[in-house]
Amino acid sequence: LRLSRGLGDVYKRQFIYTLILKPRTNQNIVIGGAAGAAPVLIGWAATGTELDTGSWLLFLLVFLWTPAHFWALSIENVEDYRGAEFPMLPTQESKKRTSIFIGVYSCATVITSLLIAPVLQLGLIYLFLALIFGIYLMIKSYGLYSNKIKPISYFVFSNTYLAVIFLSMIADILFTIRNT
């Protein structure tokens, strides 16, 4: 029941996002990020566990990661978005200004990833990888701002970053279980 209600909520949000928000505001990705992050809460709730600080931090991680990730892709494909008349941030702001937004969201994403460690009682494996990959995400963000890398480079690495964050949580938990 929780799962079906949660999936219904995601579809409703995606419908509202796709038909109402996406064609009308350059902040569509920020607003749509909630629907993209909702599966974290649905998965957590599906285990029968109450939503707590840990679940909301994981939601926040994906929510904050989403805009920077997609804005980089939008910079890469800005002419396609202009042609489709979608008001993505890069179609209405300069690449430099969009890169500043990407940097702010990247920083918030990295901080959130580090806050997760004590809340979920994760150990050194997670903390080390979150720190190293977080620093590199910030370096990529600065590289985008200073025109030293192409937007697609940030986009591709941000996929790797999020995958490593979640995989390192699993590795850390499995390592802890094995050594107890």
Where are these regions (language model features)?
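Small-residue-rich segments of transmembrane alpha-helices in multi-pass membrane proteins
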Residues: V30-T47, F155-M169
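Single conserved hydrophobic/aromatic residue that forms the stacking wall/gate
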Residues: L1-Y11
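Solvent-exposed interhelical
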Residues: L64-L114, L120
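Transmembrane alpha-helical segments that form the membrane-embedded catalytic/substrate-channel core
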Residues: K12-T18, L60-V78, V110, F133-L144
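Helix-coil boundary and interhelical linker segments in multi-pass alpha-helical membrane proteins
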Residues: R5, V40-V62, T112-I125, I170-T180
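Membrane-helix interface "capping/anchor" motifs
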Residues: L19-I29, S146
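Interfacial loop-to-transmembrane junctions
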Residues: M138-V164
